[in-house]
UniProtKB/Swiss-Prot annotation:
Entry EC no(s): 2.3.1.-
Keywords tagged on the record: Acyltransferase, Transferase
Gene: yjcF
Organism: Bacillus subtilis (strain 168)
Pfam families registered for this protein in UniProt: Acetyltransf_10
Keyword Aminoacyl-tRNA synthetase: no
UniProt-recorded name of the protein: Uncharacterized N-acetyltransferase YjcF
Membership in a protein family: Belongs to the acetyltransferase family.
SUPFAM superfamilies, per the entry: Acyl-CoA N-acyltransferases (Nat) (SSF55729)
Gene Ontology MF terms in the entry: N-acetyltransferase activity
Length: 140
C-alpha cells in the first residue's frame, strides 16, 4: 500500500470516493456537508492498495498547525495499517508545509486510534459535527 498526495483530478476523485463510502454511505453524513468550501485550500492524501483507493485524508494550515481532516479508511481495509499510513503521510506533508504541530477533531470512537499515534485530547467537552460526537485532539 502506498500514500500519495493528490496531484490531479483522478487522485482527488479517488479521495472523494473513499470519503463518500465512509462518511456519506456508512455514517450517513449529508453529502453537501462532506464536500465543503475548504477542499481547494487543503492538500489531499490517498492511500492505494494496488490501483484501488482504500484510504484518504486532507490537511490545511490553521494558526501555524496542520489541521488534519476527513481521515477515513474503507471498511474492507480497516485494521490493516491504512490509518497509520494516512497519519504519517498527512503529518509529513503538514510538517513539510511548515506546521509546528497537528490538530484534529476526532470522532469519539476513533480517539484510541489517535492516542496510539501520539495525540492527546485537548478538552473532554464533546461537540457534534454532522451529528457525530467529536473531541479536539493535538500532537506537538
Amino acid at each position: 500500500m502506498k500514500a500519495v498526495i493528490a496531484k490531479n483530478e483522478e487522485q482527488l476523485k479517488d479521495a472523494f470516493y473513499v470519503r463518500e463510502e465512509v462518511f456519506v454511505k456508512e455514517q450517513n453524513v449529508p453529502a453537501e456537508e462532506e464536500i465543503d468550501e475548504l477542499e481547494n485550500e487543503s492538500e489531499h492524501i490517498v492511500v492505494y492498495d494496488g490501483e484501488k483507493p482504500v484510504g484518504a485524508g486532507r490537511w490545511r494550515m490553521k494558526d501555524g498547525y496542520g489541521k488534519l481532516e476527513r481521515i477515513c479508511v474503507l471498511k474492507s481495509h480497516r485494521s490493516a495499517g491504512v490509518g497509520g499510513i494516512i497519519m504519517k503521510a498527512l503529518e509529513k506533508a503538514a510538517a513539510d508545509g511548515g506546521a509546528s504541530g497537528f490538530i484534529l477533531n476526532a470522532q469519539t470512537q476513533a480517539v484510541p486510534f489517535y492516542k496510539k499515534h501520539g495525540y492527546r485530547v485537548l478538552s473532554e467537552k464533546e461537540f457534534l459535527d454532522a451529528g457525530i460526537p467529536h473531541l479536539q485532539m493535538m500532537k506537538d
